[in-house]
């Protein structure tokens, strides 16, 4: 079953001579349990694709469905409920709550969904431990490095019972070892049935995906199923 369906999705900004086509007739389907990596040069539309897929921005035309629901036909409140219950986000600003510790930030989505606090904290601590952050669980965001905050945000996105993960450069501030730990965590979440769309410039990390989609000038230029390895992807994004 497709968790995310995008059909002929376009996004245009501005008018007349100033018109910019960020996305052009995008078709993308992501099934439960699948990880799709999105690659392409800067300005190719990767981040716009994520914000539209996550109902944070409306397309100029086309249809977007998450868990079978047409986002373009839902009310604002219904879209907000769908985002909270079904979609995990990792964007480059991390968006951690400053008054909560790392463990509390990770556990929060579970508690909002009614998971008992003790069980939610246990799941949060396990996710942090898998990313090498067990000793940072009681630290507040301003006590963490940028890379540590990034890993906390990723743990929070995958620990809940979300159906879809949308991640923009989840390994951007991380070294190779921590980047691979992040991809292992996302891969494990997909094995449990979550669908994931990961924007990355890193061919090594994209090779974890079941499929790689290449964007250029807002269009899908190619798709590669089950990448053979990072070397096979490098030429596509140059």
Give the location of each predicted region.
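ABC family nucleotide-binding domain
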Residues: 2-208, 215
